[in-house]
Amino acid sequence: VSYTTKLDLLNNNFGSSTAIVTSEDDGIFSRSYTSEQINNWANERWKVPVNKTFTLAFRVIAEYAGGPTYEMPEVRTVEVTVTPIKVDVFDADKVSLSGTAISSVTEIEKTVENANLYAWYGELSIGELQIPVELEGQTYYIVPSDGNGALRDGELVDVKMTETPVSWNIPSAGNYRLLIDMEKKQVRIYSPATDLKPLSVTFHLTGDASNPEVTIPVTGVLYLYGAGTGWGTKEVTFEPSMADPQILVYDAAKHNGTKYKGKMKFALAKGFTDSEGKPLMQSNGKPFDLSHSYCFTCPPKTDTEKQEISLPLGKVSELHGGVSSAVRNSYYDVPSADLLILDLRNMTILARNK
């Protein structure tokens, strides 16, 4: 007598691509499987969604050989319901916003600067907000770990993923900013009252208190200048991150593949005007220009001594801002990169490829 065992999901009918088939050795009258084996087969071979109960069919086929007549094989099948050990799932193929607080189900994207961070900025009305997640064909919800859906405005909230939604209560209409950190399992929602603001810089031209004082909001347009631009001024539009308007991202792919490299600084303006729109003039009768502007660049060697530093590709480095002569004459040697990211809140710079 020879025995063959088969294991499969109940509805697979012991298909050739799904069944676990074993031809048992002589004298073997039992078959066991470890929890790890069943879990791996469920996930990889049978594509059972994580944390879903499923039913297995186990079949034994006994075949008789060597007698004077043919004997039909005996077949016995039993069914077993398996409840997997619960796995703490926190991943996503797609993240959206839904609920009565938003006009329609809206997919939200990862930020360019941080692949673990989803961000969204837009209009919400009074109502309930949910965060549905699609993962391996199943729908889950990102919910507060403590089950409390009250808006904790601007605060970090620990979250988890469940099959049942818990809604955040949006108490007033307006533009909200929502951040989901998939690595730290935290959500932060900013209302209009607590929302992050763009950087605004107030300075005296050239840093001399006797020169006019100006205020420049940093909304995305910067002026590149240095050997890398041929000592000409390049007006470049950086895109404020959805996560924080003080994170400015230049994506070469959105600018016909144009990449800026070489020694350069990032100035706030190339010219200055008064309240009537007239150019601000120096004592020599010439207008103030980019060379007198506040700029972002590498740290100077000292408060009075400039320097030039190579910016390593793929490494977050220190960004310095100022208007002194030492700062205005210091330059980062920027490598060719797909992305150039200036974090003005934390004063860092990163050039990296996608």
Feature names for model-found ranges:
Residues 1-6, 13-17, 24-354:
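Insoluble glucan recognition modules
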